[in-house]
Structures are given as structure tokens and as C-alpha cells.
Amino acid sequence: MTNYAIILAAGKGTRMTSDLPKVLHKVSGLTMLEHVFRSVKAINPEKAVTVIGHKSEMVRAVLADQSAFVHQTEQLGTGHAVMMAETQLEGLEGHTLVIAGDTPLITGESLKSLIDFHVNHKNVATILTATAQDPFGYGRIVRNKDGEVIKIVEQKDANEYEQQLKEINTGTYVFDNKRLFEALKCITTNNAQGEYYLTDVVAIFRANKEKVGAYILRDFNESLGVNDRVALATAETVMRQRITQKHMVNGVTFQNPETVYIESDVEIAPDVLIEGNVTLKGRTHIGSGTVLTNGTYIVDSEIGDNCVVTNSMIESSVLAAGVTVGPYAHLRPGTTLDREVHIGNFVEVKGSHIGEKTKAGHLTYIGNAQVGSSVNVGAGTITVNYDGQNKYETVIGDHAFIGSNSTLIAPLEVGDNALTAAGSTISKTVPADSIVIGGSRQVTKEGYAKRLAHHPSGSK
């Protein structure tokens, strides 16, 4: 059995009120088109053809070499869009799935079941349908007294009886590939919209006494086509629920799943605890036994086993096992923390590697630095890495002790076991095992404060 796929992605999406093509709006971190394409891959298509139109280069870039593309210059209806794919699929033996690129909730399992139903029933066409409590706006499935599908009628063309029908067309179909393109040559624009309806091929097949069937979705949510921001929000809600439920089944604990945002490509190991208002985005991996507390935001990062991240932001960083971060810390892109590192409150790290068991507990900036293991970085320490034009590196050796309020002016190297005194400004190499005092010498003038305005006896 050879399968093909046609994805309809040419529309502008006027009701989205956006410069972005409709299918490129995101749901849980992926464009709607990407969600659809991932589901389509479940049927293992020999060839996938994406019909593009509005801002076609932007749409093409999302799938790149994963699909063939055809261009629909004018949007003259779904039938016309499928006609555009004829140059890619004409004459091929097999079954062709036709699906809209704005249906992000459709699952691969449902598409595979649709194909299997189509093949097992030897249909020339099979419609994916659903039962709607409120079918207004959808095309209706019209059956005869024997339950056979005889036609699909659009909302604007439906009579009073047809408008009462609850079974609706989801806009997804499977066809015998050759018969599809033969039937498309016979459809017209004689309808309320003045468009080429793909659904008109059903009546053509029926007139030729060819078998048309319908496979009914179990989950109505999968039929959602996103045409505006309201539907986009609905899709986001459903997808978020799916994602959190998947992780819970796999052993992740959520204290308040309704407030958590987790994107589609995030991986979470068992025995992770996630509190409320946590955001996990991009290609993030969370290791087993890790705890993410309220307000944590992580994107494109790898978090090792048994870490604790407390109300902090982590971007494009790698944390080994046993690391603790926060509260209110910020790990910026290019940060790597080895085992059991502690990054405390109001500490910012960027583009740096920090060795195991090193601690930076408070109010510190570490940028463009290589920090060894078992280093203590005192409160208020700053690596001065930028001169207005270039960034420079700071290297701190193993077991060094950086005193509070040290200012380390890069390029700079502090050797193993070295110590900087509190309040020092360091601009030259500190040899291993050395103590450096870089602050100004204290001068005390007894009684002088009485002459200053702040003193009770001072001048006013």
C-alpha cells in the first residue's frame, strides 16, 4: 500500500488579523503546519506535497526538504488547491490523504486509523467526520437510509433539514489517488461561494456508483480548524492538557498542571516534581528527581538529575546532576554548570563554565568565565568582561576563594587556591596559592564626622 499526502497551506487567514500566514501561528511551541506534518508522518507517505500561496517562502522554510511544494496563486477553493498538486501526483497508484494545515490537534493515530478504514472498506473516498453539538459553520455529512454517504453540503448551501445534521466534515479525506484527479476535472464553481469545492467529488463518485465512506473521530477536539485567535487559544488549551497528561502518565508530578506551560518537544524524566507557573520551552530536557519550583522559566536547556531550580530563568544552558539554582537567578545562553554547583539568589551567569561544587551564593555576575571546581565566589563579585567593543575571558582556578565585592577585570587569571580580599579590584594575574589585596588602604580620621551634615552636632 502506497500512501501520499497533500497538505493545504496556501491561505492567508484573514480572521487571524496578522501579517503571519495562518499555518505558521504556533501551538505549544510548534507551528500548526509542523503539528499537522508530524501527524501526517504516521501514515508513512511516499510523497508529501504542501500547497502554498500567501507568503509562500515563509511557509516553505518551515518544512524545507521534508515536502514537495506547489504554488496556488489564487485561492479559489479547496478543490482548486488540490488540483495544484496534480503535477506531483498525477497517475500514481495509491491512496492520498488531503488535510488542512490549520488542524494542529489531529493525531497520527487518527490518520492511521482513517487510512486503514479506507483500505479495509475498499473505498474510493473516505471522509474523516465528527459529531458536533453545534454544527453551525461546518459542512454536513448527508447519508441515505442505509447509512451510506451520498454527499457533503456546505453551510451556505445546506437546506433546513441538512442544517440540523450533527455529523460534520472535518476537512480531512483519503482518496484513491488516480480517481481523485480524474474527478477534480469535473467539478465546477456553481455554488454559493463561487469556488471549487473538493467535497463535490463525493457526488461524482456516488454518481459513478463508487464506494464512499466516512470514519468518525472519537475526539471532537481533533477536528478543530483554527481560523481566528479564539480557536488558536482553544487549540493551545487542548494541546497543553495533552502534554501535561502525557508527562503525568510517564511519572512526572505536577502540583498545579493548569498553570504550567510545556512545549511539545520538551522531555521530562520520571520522578520530576513541577510546581505551578513553570514554563518549559524549546528542546529542553529535565532529568529524573529534579524539582522545579513556582515561577521557573527554562528554554532550550538540559537539566541533570536531582537538580533544584527555584524561581529562576535558564536559557540555552547545561546543568549536571545535583545543581541548585535560585531563587531569582538567571543563567544565560552558553552556561555550563558541573555537578553540585550552587548558583544562589540574584546571580547571573552567561557564556561560562563552572566546575563542580563551586558556589556563587549571592548578587554576582559571571560572564565569559572559566571557573574551576570547589571555588567560593563571594557576594557582589563581578567579572568585568566588556570594554565597549570586545568581550574578554576570566579564568579562576580550582579551590580559589573570591572575596565579597571583588571586581575581576578581564582578561584575567586567578590561580588555584588563590584568595582575593573583600572589596578588591583585580586587573593582573593572581598566581596560585596567593592572596591579593586590591582595595584602597583604610584611613580613619577620628572626630571628623562631627563636622559633616549627617551628624547630630554637624553644621546645618
UniProtKB/Swiss-Prot annotation:
Acetyl-CoA binds at residues 379, 385-386, 404, 422. Residues 1-229 are annotated as: Pyrophosphorylase. It catalyses: alpha-D-glucosamine 1-phosphate + acetyl-CoA = N-acetyl-alpha-D-glucosamine 1-phosphate + CoA + H(+); N-acetyl-alpha-D-glucosamine 1-phosphate + UTP + H(+) = UDP-N-acetyl-alpha-D-glucosamine + diphosphate. GO terms for biological process: cell morphogenesis; cell wall organization; lipid A biosynthetic process; peptidoglycan biosynthetic process; regulation of cell shape; UDP-N-acetylglucosamine biosynthetic process. Mg(2+) binds at residues 102, 227. Catalyzes the last two sequential reactions in the de novo biosynthetic pathway for UDP-N-acetylglucosamine (UDP-GlcNAc). The C-terminal domain catalyzes the transfer of acetyl group from acetyl coenzyme A to glucosamine-1-phosphate (GlcN-1-P) to produce N-acetylglucosamine-1-phosphate (GlcNAc-1-P), which is converted into UDP-GlcNAc by the transfer of uridine 5-monophosphate (from uridine 5-triphosphate), a reaction catalyzed by the N-terminal domain. This is Bifunctional protein GlmU. It comes from Streptococcus pyogenes serotype M4 (strain MGAS10750). The gene is glmU.
